Amino acid sequence: MNNSLENTISFEEYIRVKARSVPQHRMKEFLDSLASKGPEALQEFQQTATTTMVYQQGGNCIYTDSTEVAGSLLELACPVTTSVQPQTQQEQQIQVQQPQQVQVQVQVQQSPQQVSAQQLSPQFTVHQPAEQPIQVQVQIQGQAPQSAAPSIQTPSLQSPSPSQLQAAQIQVQHVQAAQQIQAAEIPEEHIPHQQIQAQLVAGQSLAGGQQIQIQTVGALSPPPSQQGSPREGERRVGTASVLQPVKKRKVDMPITVSYAISGQPVATVLAIPQGQQQSYVSLRPDLLTVDSAHLYSATGTITSPTGETWTIPVYSAQPRGDPQQQSITHIAIPQEAYNAVHVSGSPKALAAVKLEDDKEKMVGTTSVVKNSHEEVVQTLANSLFPAQFMNGNIHIPVAVQAVAGTYQNTAQTVHIWDPQQQPQQQTAQEQTPPPQQQQQQLQVTCSAQTVQVAEVEPQSQPQPSPELLLPNSLKPEEGLEVWKNWAQTKNAELEKDAQNRLAPIGRRQLLRFQEDLISSAVAELNYGLCLMTREARNGEGEPYDPDVLYYIFLCIQKYLFENGRVDDIFSDLYYVRFTEWLHEVLKDVQPRVTPLGYVLPSHVTEEMLWECKQLGAHSPSTLLTTLMFFNTKYFLLKTVDQHMKLAFSKVLRQTKKSPSNPKDKSTSIRYLKALGIHQTGQKVTDDMYAEQTENPENPLRCPIKLYDFYLFKCPQSVKGRNDTFYLTPEPVVAPNSPIWYSVQPISREQMGQMLTRILVIREIQEAIAVANATTMH
């Protein structure tokens, strides 16, 4: 055999060549595999090709690649597959200590309902067993000492003589049919379909044995008027650009439906979602952060077929001096649970129910008032209506519209019940009950009757005004539509001005803005965005609110990314003029408060910034913005001066072992709050620190992982400095570049622009509001 050896190399040389192509973060794994498997390991380690694009911006080169994140942060991306096993049956008994004994029994069964797979993230797998019907039956029985039924006279009762209170029975039935939701070109999945059936039985000593029974059967599906909406279908779509299921937007909407008639006490009926009792702990107010797996289970949150996820604010373990906030638990109830009811009856019936428990304390308020004519009680059927704090409670406005009787076709105004504004005057003819009767939590004043409550057709529901609709995610087509409308209006103005003026000699072609964002040049897009900050108008011809305008620009940014443009309009050097103009619009933004005292939440949410790559490690500027966002949210640094005082030496990294399992460790970074106000030699305690904890469920959004990655990309000489924390990004970098930042801190002007955009985010405003409320108490 005459085999030529000219083009052959030794095995050791081949290993050296192969090792050069192995990524640095997999080198240890390569060497270990080579020692154990031998030559077979060479086939396993192939360098994956990534498309890296570098485009020119003046004297700077900006990178982009298809890896979605940069450098060593890729190894943090671990796809998660979670199996959701539905509970077939549950029986819970809760003993509530009150003046009367109360027993609650819950039975749960489940049956599937077809919804769009858009509600689930791409790598989220659902395992569903056989079809099982779900029923929740709650029965509360209470006994109280019997006494003679007193005679009560009120001016509201139109009777010739005082009426004796008799046994009354109220039956409420609320049925909604299961609905199917389908989205175009998306495979369907089966998720549990819930039907809730509740029965409430309580006794009262006022009327010698009265009984109230309330039974509701509701299917968690939207009304037909909302199924056909394409925007609602788009709202349920989660982003597919990350390796893990993306958290959906959590709307902090504990629902308490209530309205009252002047001079009367308030009736209260509270629906408790299944599987939530274990999640409520009477602790410090905080927004519950639920990982992606919990978004689709029955614990912690409720995800309705419309795509909205209801989040429960819980409390953390510091005791509080304010007894009112210790006794309040806000419960999220799906939209269909308070949709619309049809009330008929003659006399007024009023009831109040209060349930208390050692671990969870609830106060719910819902009033049921029956006049001499039929009424339609319709809530603003919008699951995105901003529910806010008012005197420790959260309320939803209720619109009362008369459809029969003396007030036919007359719409009444919206009433928001406030416990402190409740009328104090009582009827002179009403007799004062004995002290033992005043202690009862259930009070009923009515004559023998039966009241039927049925669902009203969805067509009769009042349509919420557009300003009440708060989006859950970015809609790129909305940003494109606003740009097109503005471009058409601006081009018409330019043409009109050109006709009224004489064209100068040698004049170039008339400037026209292209309606297609993708084909717009960088300079043209920058100039157009600058003008939009001042000239953009909504459908009514009015200027956009600052937070809505910021939301539109985020939609435009997402549209550019989704269509192949790598421009970052918030950080690229070519868009400096636009960021300056946007800063002028946003710098004086304060949370909007309605005349009734409600704080309207911002249109911009944290999830939206993750969607359009304004948070994360996609570039040096984005990583710097992410660190400032976390420092504002958790360290509560609200001003530029506070951020300027932050330094590497003042941020401490701490690792704790779990008391139950020493092998489990949790890492956090801490910052001494109000640094400088503590006296010299004063002992520093844990409550003096603000803390950021790790997020093991999603490492790509973990504050600790991103802080470590920031330190990894900073020069070694600045990591111990005590005068700076935010460094200037280098103009030309690559994803695998070891240094992303210079040793110079960012300017005060640049920091102010970044912080202004951060303070508009809804979660930041909520965190600051909770901190202010805590300091006031």
UniProtKB/Swiss-Prot annotation:
Which residues are recorded as modified (Phosphoserine)? S346, S465
User: Which subcellular locations apply to this protein?
Assistant: Nucleus; Cytoplasm; Cell membrane
One GO MF term on file is: DNA binding
CARD domain ranges (all copies): 6-48
Which residue ranges does UniProt annotate as crossing the membrane? Answer: none
Keyword Transcription regulation listed: yes
Q: Which InterPro entries match?
A: DUF3504, ZnF_MYMT-QRICH1
List every position bearing N-acetylmethionine.
M1
Query: Would you kindly state one Gene Ontology biological process term found in this protein's UniProt entry?
Result: kidney development
According to UniProt, the tissues expressing it are described as:
Expressed highly in prefrontal cortex, craniofacial area and near the limbs of mouse embryos. Expressed in heart, skeletal muscle, liver, kidney, lung, brain, spleen, intestine and growth plate in mice.
- Per the record, what is one GO cellular component? cytoplasm
Q: Where is this cross-link: Glycyl lysine isopeptide (Lys-Gly) (interchain with G-Cter in SUMO2)?
A: K354, K359
**Which parts of the sequence are annotated with region: Disordered?**
140-164, 219-240, 420-440
What keyword terms does UniProt attach to this protein? Acetylation, Cell membrane, Cytoplasm, Isopeptide bond, Membrane, Nucleus, Phosphoprotein, Transcription, Transcription regulation, Ubl conjugation, Unfolded protein response
Its domain description in UniProt is: The CARD domain may be involved in the regulation of caspase activity in the context of programmed cell death.
**Family annotation (PANTHER family):** TRANSCRIPTIONAL REGULATOR QRICH1, ZINC FINGER MYM-TYPE PROTEIN
General function of this protein: Transcriptional regulator that acts as a mediator of the integrated stress response (ISR) through transcriptional control of protein homeostasis under conditions of ER stress. Controls the outcome of the unfolded protein response (UPR), an ER-stress response pathway that either promotes recovery of ER homeostasis and cell survival, or triggers the terminal UPR which elicits programmed cell death when ER stress is prolonged and unresolved.
- Give the protein name, as stated in the record: Transcriptional regulator QRICH1
Q: Which gene encodes it?
A: Qrich1
